[in-house]
Regions:
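Fe(II)/2-oxoglutarate oxygenase catalytic core
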Residues: 1-160, 166-196
Length: 196
């Protein structure tokens, strides 16, 4: 896992993100990357800032970027393994392929970025991540609470988190405040959902 604070130096760009309704619109999107098409919106511009010249991760060959946003507050509550979560424990995967063929194919790399200052007022909403808990451990016996201790990362304004999104992770229950984040997964092959 890589965590970098104050990653984006252009704070005016982050202010634009905070107030841009299109940036925060729900749903999953795909971006082929700056080498295949010019960025056409703020999300794609952010992806380029994170992964082009400024990439904190060694170069990887990628087919592109799946991206989406989440806005959570205290009303978002899911229960899993007798605990309450804003975003329940899960593995990022090619969702359509998993539903159609029961195959788990995970992204190369996962990214979470917190572009809004209000995140610093948040209570709860921690990212829990188990580096040694891939989906194969849960397939036969169902999901169970891991013996290993998770990494627990506090959301923070302008914090970039790079991690293995194919391993178990989730977001703890929010006590107060609002948690807005963008998630970006790098894939070596475009997920089947985007092939239609």
């Amino acid at each position: 896992m890589i965590i970098i604070d104050n990653f984006i130096k252009d704070l005016d760009f982050l202010k634009k993100i905070e107030v841009n309704e299109d940036f925060w619109r729900g749903g999953y999107s795909w971006y082929d990357g700056w080498w295949g098409q010019k960025a056409s919106n703020l999300r794609e511009e952010l992806i380029e800032m994170l992964w082009a010249e400024n990439s904190p991760h060694p170069s990887v060959h990628t087919a592109g970027f799946e991206h989406w946003t989440h806005t959570f507050d205290y009303t978002n509550v899911q229960t899993k393994l007798d605990r309450e979560w804003a975003l329940s424990l899960h593995f990022d995967k090619d969702e359509k392929l998993c539903a159609d063929e029961n195959r788990f194919v995970s992204p190369l790399i996962g990214t979470v970025f917190y572009p809004c200052r209000e995140i610093d007022e948040l209570q709860g909403g921690m990212l829990y991540h188990w580096e040694k808990f891939p989906p194969q451990r849960a397939q036969d016996n169902g999901l169970f609470w891991p013996e290993e201790e998770p990494e627990i990362i506090k959301p923070k304004f302008n914090r970039l988190i790079i991690f293995d999104a194919g391993c178990l992770h989730g977001v703890s229950k929010i006590i107060s405040g609002r948690r807005r984040a963008i998630a970006i997964n790098l894939w070596d092959k475009k997920p089947t959902e985007f092939n239609d």
